[in-house]
Amino acid sequence: MLKQVEIFTDGSCLGNPGPGGYGAILRYRGHEKTFSAGYTRTTNNRMELMAAIVALEALKEHCEVILSTDSQYVRQGITQWIHNWKKRGWKTADKKPVKNVDLWQRLDAALGQHQIKWEWVKGHAGHPENERCDELARAAAMNPTLEDTGYQVEV
């Protein structure tokens, strides 16, 4: 039987692009571990992706996961768009390169053999864990220490 894990995530950006951060909570049998980090120049979508990636990469064995995010970009990307992106060699329907491909590929790899149920929660609507993740992400964004080497300025 797989371990049942809950993950809650959020990303924040002070300006888009600008300093950003992510926050994540991993819960297993009432025990919680939090994750957060801040980047000097990034985007909100990249931080939303990083929150999910870091939490999933922390899992040491195959798990049954309920992952809650307030990002439709992340939820739709992983449940609907990614399959066609991969078939097209990481291109969109109009043959343009997928944005944030480095993180989408990393998220795809982090899924591993986990059974994941992706849940969308409305942001800033009083969901306790989402609010905590938002606080972690915003605090990290206000004190960025890392460089987002995968961030590319759009021209």
Swiss-Prot record:
Family: Belongs to the RNase H family.
Subcellular location: Cytoplasm
GO BP term (any one): DNA replication, removal of RNA primer
Keyword rRNA-binding applies: no
Disulfide bond entries: none
Cofactor binding, note field: Binds 1 Mg(2+) ion per subunit. May bind a second metal ion at a regulatory site, or after substrate binding.
Binding of Mg(2+) 2, residues: D10, D134
Keyword terms: Cytoplasm, Endonuclease, Hydrolase, Magnesium, Metal-binding, Nuclease
Cofactor(s) this protein cannot do without: Mg(2+)
UniProt xrefs under InterPro entries: RNase_H, RNaseH-like_sf, RNaseH_domain, RNaseH_sf, RNaseHI
Gene behind this protein: rnhA
Record note on quaternary structure: Monomer.
Lineage: Bacteria, Pseudomonadati, Pseudomonadota, Gammaproteobacteria, Enterobacterales
Protein name: Ribonuclease H
Catalytic reaction annotation: Endonucleolytic cleavage to 5'-phosphomonoester
EC category: hydrolase
CDD domains (UniProt xref): RNase_HI_prokaryote_like
SUPFAM superfamilies xref list: Ribonuclease H-like
Entry-linked HAMAP family: RNase_H
GO molecular function terms attached to this record: magnesium ion binding; nucleic acid binding; RNA-DNA hybrid ribonuclease activity
Protein EC: 3.1.26.4
Physiological role: Endonuclease that specifically degrades the RNA of RNA-DNA hybrids.
Domain RNase H type-1 stretches: 1-142
Pfam families reported in the protein's UniProt record: RNase_H
A cellular-component GO term for this protein: cytoplasm
